[in-house]
């Protein structure tokens, strides 16, 4: 069971919650795979009318998991060829049901781009969007 992505049903709404609070919901392969699986499940469920993607009150998603990128074995070229972080994002864009990003707290880098992949963004008053990749010497993974 994928515990970094939680799936709930509330009436006709399918809720997908990124659940990595210790890492400010930083995105990694497990998160990307879990979100894609949840979207697939809600798409197959005829009782679901829309899908809401969210994080927690501190962070929607604070971008790519930089701790993975800092590992000496991390290969940037391989990461871009294999769609590190952005893998499965196309699944959100192609969903037949509307996907709404409910953003509270930080949506930075890949988290900001992830929210932009949704059909609509509902931003809380404390939502903060940004593309800080330049500060670590890289470009936005999905183009910004």
Predicted regions: what they are:
Residues 1-56, 72, 90:
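Conserved CoA-thioester-binding segment of acyl-CoA-metabolizing enzymes
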Residues 16, 53, 65, 114-116:
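Hydrophobic/aromatic residues within transmembrane alpha-helices
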Residues 16, 20, 98-99, 129:
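Buried hydrophobic positions in well-ordered alpha/beta secondary-structure cores of metabolic enzymes
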Residues 55-91, 107, 135-137:
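Glycine- (often His-adjacent) and acidic-residue-rich active-site loop
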Residues 88-95, 102, 108-144:
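CoA-thioester-processing core
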